[in-house]
Amino acid sequence: VTQVKLGKKIAKILKVPMMVHVGEPPALYDEVLEILGPGDVVTHCFNGKSGSSIMEDEDLFNLAERCASEGVRLDIGHGGASFSFKVAEAAIARGLLPHSISTDLHGHSMNFPVWDLATTMSKLLSVGMPFDKVVNAVTHAPAEVIKLDMQNRLSVGARSDFTIFDLVDSD
């Protein structure tokens, strides 16, 4: 917890948001949430790890819900072992959506279970996150965190980078 508090102090001095990884304790998920404020990001928000899953403890779920409503941004941060279908499905069914969807892609997660951002997006669709919210969570939402202006990004003469997806129902 001391490291998280120190990080928060530095983030305040630099006037930047802080991003914190939650998973195995220490620090506990609730302790991290209590330190974060509006604009800060907690990643691995839907992990299923013992002692750190928002679905293990109703108080922790309520705290995550309250913090999200106050501006703490929940990020998927899938990674190699930090995404639980069960937790994501239950949280989304209760109305708690992630602010952003990220892969946490690294050498141990690239070939399984993350694969790529499109696969991670598909996982969120499969557990009930609405399509428009999924698209926002990989475009405007993360851009907002780093204060990237998204106005007129697709306009005549502007440099654009986009992907076209084919949405297919499947198991």
Please provide the spans of the model-predicted regions:
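Active-site core of metal-dependent hydrolases
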Residues: 1-111
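Short, Lys/Arg- and Gly-enriched loop/turn segments at beta-strand edges
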Residues: 169-171
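His/Asp/Glu-enriched, well-ordered alpha-helical/loop segment
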Residues: 86-165
